[in-house]
Amino acid sequence: MIPACIKSNTHYIDITGEISVYDYAYSKHNEAVSSNIVLCPGVGSDVIPTDCLAVFLKDKCPDATHLSMAWATIGSKPSKGTAKTAVEGINHGGKVRKNGEIISVPIAYKERLIDFGFAELNTMTIPWGDIFTAYHSTN
């Protein structure tokens, strides 16, 4: 879809949260700029809000070298598409960024108990799009 958007000078948006899609869109950045279009995966409720939080935190803590984010929802469920993508992705394992590189790790590579204010919840790492995007948006 991205090549067709570049060729037709049409902006590209989607609701994905997959690292591979961000990586591909980023690799096409110069072509998109030449076509005067925006390539923006992740316009759903997953990556753009958390990426904005990452930039906000970087502005408030400019000397920070690491970022750890967590979120929780009350009473909501993943969409059918999100659940399907998560199940399909289990075979690919987890991902983290270490020393500037995205590396493969086991599913739930790290677990942590976090107090979200409304409850203490067990959390785990997931291969979310922020692993790709936050690195670029926070430099």
Please tell me what each predicted stretch does.
Residues 2-3, 7, 15-38:
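Rossmann-fold NAD(P)-binding glycine/threonine-rich loop
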Residues 17, 42-46, 123:
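Glycine- and other small-residue-rich loops at beta-strand/loop junctions that grip anionic moieties
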Residues 59-139:
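Active-site-lining helix/loop region of Rossmann-like oxidoreductase modules
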Residues 36-74:
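Adenosine-phosphate binding glycine-rich loop
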Residues 6-7, 29-34, 57-60, 84-88:
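Short, hinge-like loop/turn segments at secondary-structure boundaries
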